[in-house]
Amino acid sequence: MVHVRYGGQNGEQYELAISENHIVVRTESRSSLISDRPFEAAPVSPQARNILNQFELSTRFSQAGVEVLHVKEPSHDGALRDTAREILNQEPEVQFAGRVLIDPVSQQPIVYTENLFVKFDHEEDVSFCQEILGRYGLTIKRQLEYARNAYFVSAPSNTGLAIFDISERLLNEESVELCHPELVREFRQRQAFPPQWHLKQTTIGGKTINAHANVEAAWKLSDGTGTIIAIIDDGVDIDHEEFRSSGKIVAPRDVTRKTNFPTPGNRDNHGTACAGVACGNGNFGASGVAPGAKLMPIRFVSALGSQDEADSFVWAAQNGADVISCSWGPPDGTWWDDKDPLHKQKVPLPDSTRLAMDYAINKGRNGKGCVILFAAGNGNESVDNDGYASYEKVIAVAACNDFGTRSAYSDFGTAVWCAFPSNNGNPSQTPGIWTADRTGVVGYNSGNTNLGDQAGNYTNSFGGTSSACPGAAGVAALILSRNPNLRWDEVRDIIKRSCDRIDPVGGNYNAEGRSPFYGYGRINALKAVELALPAQPEPVSIFTAVQDVPINDLQISQLSLAIANTNPIKSIKVTVDIEHTYIGDLVVSLNPPAESGVLPIILHDRKGGGADDIKQTYDEVSTPGLTALKGKIPQGTWTLEVADKAQADTGKIRSLTIELGF
C-alpha cells in the first residue's frame, strides 16, 4: 500500500494498492502497443510481442501518451507483470514500463507520474520556496497562478514509488501547506448506464424501452454542477463509490442522533438509493439525474411530525441546499386493496414543519428559495389527503412506468405536479430503476446479479414515487445549474412547462392540461434545461400611480392608472404598496381595462393574518391569473381594488406600479 494525503498534514489520508496485474507503458512514438489494427501497433521484438499477447488494453491516457495494460488471466504474485516490465524496458521503442496503483475498493487503475503539487504558506518568499524544492531534487515545471506559492514540480527520472515518500516528507516541512503526487485516473463522460432506461432510450433483455425523461440529452447543457441536493431520508452510504469523489458530500447531518454522521442503520437502504437516483456521480455503475450536483445527506428516522422533521429543513436551508428531496410521508394504504382504511386517512402538515418548510422557501438560496419536492405516495389513493405532499409550496411527484403510463401504485389528485419514471409491478418490462445501493451485501442487493451487480453496490429494482421524487429533484438541480438566479417558484413553473403529456387517452387531462395521475405530464429534462436560460430582454414600459387612498373598515378603495400603449402584452409584473395593520382583512384585485375582456385578477385573498402592510410584486409565476393578459392591448384604465372585509383595522393604498413587456 502507498498513501496520499489531501488537505495538508492534517488532511484525510487515502490508501492505494499496487496492482499485481497492471502495467503502464509509454512508447517513444506515442503509438499503442496493443491495437485492433496490428499495422498501427508500435514496433517491438517478437519476445516483447509474445509477452504483450498475454495483456489487454485497460485504458489509455492520450494526453500523457501512456496506456494501462491488464493481464488477461490475473494472478496474485505479480510475476507476469514483473516479467513484462523487464522485457519491455529493454525495447528501444518503449520509454518506460512501470507499475500501476489501484483503488482498493473499486479496483480502478490509477497512474502515478513523477510530478508533485506543492503549496507553501502564504508568507514564504519565492527564493525560500525554490530552496526547499531544490533540497529535494525537484524541478519547477510551473508556478501556478491560481494559488499563492503553489508549484507544479517534477522529480528525477526513475523516482518511481519514492514519489510518495517525497510527498510525505515535504508535508512535514513547517513551511509546506499542501503537497501530493500527481495521480491520474480514467476520465469518463457522464453516462447513462445500460440498465438506466429512465435516463435515455435503451434496450434491456432485447426490448427497446422508450419511456425516459430525456436526461442524458440534457447533460450536454447541464449536469447539475454548482448545485446542492439535500436528501432527507434514512441515511446515505457516503462511502459508496458513486458519492466518494472529492467535495461531493456537503454538510452531512443526522437530525435523529444529533450528529454529523448520516450513516444508515442496519436496515436503512432507502436513502442511499434515493441519493443515487438524484445525483450519483456515474463514474462506476449508476448515474444520477444530476451527476455534477453535490449531495447533502440528512438522516431523519424520527416520528412523522417530530421536531426533528422540522430541523431537517432548517439544516438544509442554512447549509446551502438548493433542492430538498423527501421520499417519505404518512403511511400508504395497500395499493391493490380498495378496502384498506388507510386510503381514507387525512394526515395534516404540522405547523412546526410547515414553518420550517417556509423558512427554507423564504430564506434558502439567499432568498430565492429552496425547491422542495415530495413523493406523492404509493397507495393508489388521493395525495390530497397527505398534508406534506399536497402543501402548496412543494412539488408532488407521481410515478410513471416503463410503458409510459401510470405506475399502478402511484397516488393521484389535484396536488400532483408532475411525473417521473419509476417501476411498476405487473406488467413490467424492467425490474425497476437501476441505482446505487449500500456497498456490499448489506443493501437491497446482497450480491445477486438478478438483483443488480455482483458486488452488491447497485440495485436494479428501486422504485415507487420514492424513486420518482429524487429523479425530479435532479432535474431541478439541472435547471438551477443552468440558471442559478431562478426563484423556487420559477423552477417549479419550468418543470411544469417542460412536461410531456403522456398517456393522452388515460391521463384524464383537464382544460389547463393537468392530469390527476401525471400532473402536467412526465418531466422532459432537456426541455427543462432549455427553458432555464433567461429570455432575451424585451422592451419594457413601467407605469406608476402614487396617491394615498384611505382603506376604511368594510369599504372598497381604488387607485386607478391610465395606460395609452397599444402594443400587445408579452409579460406583466404588478407591484403594490399598501399600508394596513391587519392584511388578513384584505382582498386585493387588479381590474384590467374593460376593453381587454379580462376579469378582475385576485392578487391577495385575506392571507397573512395580523401582519402589517403589503409591499409585493406579482408576476405570471406567482399569480397565474396574470397570464390571461398576454396578447391583450393594455390601453385603458387599470384599477387596483382593495376590499376591507373586517372591522377594527384601517390603512391606505400608497402606490400601484405595472411593468409591461412588449
From Swiss-Prot:
Cytoplasm among keywords:
yes
> Which UniProt key words apply to this protein?
Calcium, Cytoplasm, Hydrolase, Protease, Serine protease, Zymogen
Keyword flag Calcium:
yes
Gene Ontology MF terms: serine-type endopeptidase activity
Q: Where does this one sit in the cell? A: Cytoplasm
* Active site residues according to the UniProt entry: D233, H270, S466
Output the CDD domains linked to this UniProt entry: Peptidases_S8_15
**What's in the GO CC field?**
cytoplasm; endomembrane system; intracellular membrane-bounded organelle; membrane
This protein's source sits in the domain of life called Bacteria
Where the record annotates domain P/Homo B, the positions are 535-662
All copies of domain Peptidase S8, residue ranges: 196-529
Q: What InterPro entries does the database record attribute to this sequence?
A: Galactose-bd-like_sf, P_dom, Pep_S8_PrcA, Peptidase_S8/S53_dom, Peptidase_S8/S53_dom_sf, Peptidase_S8_Asp-AS, Peptidase_S8_His-AS, Peptidase_S8_Ser-AS
Taking the first listed entry, what is the main subcellular location of this protein, grouped into a coarse class? Answer: cytoplasm
Q: Report the function annotation for this chain.
A: Degrades phycobiliproteins in vitro. Has a substrate specificity similar to that of trypsin.
Similarity section = Belongs to the peptidase S8 family.
What PANTHER family would the database entry show?
NEUROENDOCRINE CONVERTASE 1, PROPROTEIN CONVERTASE SUBTILISIN/KEXIN-RELATED
Q: What is this protein called?
A: Calcium-dependent protease
Biological source species:
Trichormus variabilis (strain ATCC 29413 / PCC 7937)
Organism lineage reads as:
Bacteria, Bacillati, Cyanobacteriota, Cyanophyceae, Nostocales
